[in-house]
Amino acid sequence: MPRRRRNTVSRIWSSALNAIDIECPARLHLGFIDPGASSGRRFGSLGLALDGLGTHLRVQRVRTAREAYFAAGERAGAERERALACLARLRRAFDFDAPLAIELLDAIPPHAGLGSGTQLSLALGYAVARLAGRDAAQRRIAQHTERGARSGIGIGVFEQGGFVVDGGRAEQTAVPPIVARHPFPAAWRVLLVFDAMHAGLSGEAEASAFRALPPFPARDTERIAALTLMHVLPALAEVDFERFGPAVTEIQARVGDHFAPAQGGRYASPRVARWLDWFAARGAACHGQSSWGPTGFVMTASAEEARILIEAAKAARAADDPVRFRIVAGRNAGARIVESRDGAPMHAS
């Protein structure tokens, strides 16, 4: 009998419920398997949850007639309008009008290819659903918040963390199902390459780009599927970075070249592209772009290898180069959720 996949969302709660605190991870989207549906299912995605970079919010009932919103930090403040728009959709979906305070303590950089919108929507959706006494299943919330139309990766990392693969969409699919999940090796690292001067495609611009692209070649789908099943996933199971890295890089090249007409090249940001070429010339075997970018990544087999690369890059970077670097690990757990109702509802000022 197949073993049931473990949901690694961590929840802590008390017997009564008044407030919910959620911290959920950013993710890399490592490419589509079949955006042209030549296999009979469309899209199919590979992704990885990231540790040390995520969205953290707290939602609490308040004694006030109007909504209260609190934000801490530049990234969190920039997400105010998106959070309130998402809340409005959730209120309609759940027919729930109790006043709430939202404190956004940290946020994934928006429009950077790291899943900021999906994680914010899932976290806020879970909190509102629980406070409203409604179904808090992530796939239901994704539908209410108009997430997961093309990829189930964001939902997968919210629920489980780790390295996940979704099975794409059939005609009746609401949200693409997660069909494989492996823990990301603890020793491996991800060096992120940020370009704050460039924004990846999203919303209607993203939808228009998909419509304008030519059909995805069936031979590329066949190759990416083979790389995923026979290289990437076995390499994770066997902690074999030498097999894993080149397979991910090849997937990235095939997908990036297909999307090049929409994003201006294999990578969206010319600055990030130059740095990825720079890392590759120094032996980095695993590199690419997350989603529509502009964030690029280099994966390494150890923290020391990542440290050597980032120190060399910082030494070579010009003073006026806006590109920044950061080393993170993979995250093998989903969202951390604390539910509580200790004392009376807070008063919002």
Where are these regions (language model features)?
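ATP-binding N-lobe of GHMP and related small-molecule kinases
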Residues: 4, 9-112, 126-138, 149, ...
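DPxDG-like acidic metal-binding loop motif
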Residues: 114-138, 157-168
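ATP-dependent small-molecule kinase catalytic core of the GHMP/sugar-kinase superfamily
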Residues: 11-23, 31-33, 38-45, 137-285, ...
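Small/polar glycine-rich anion-binding or flexible loop at a beta-alpha turn
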Residues: 265, 290-297
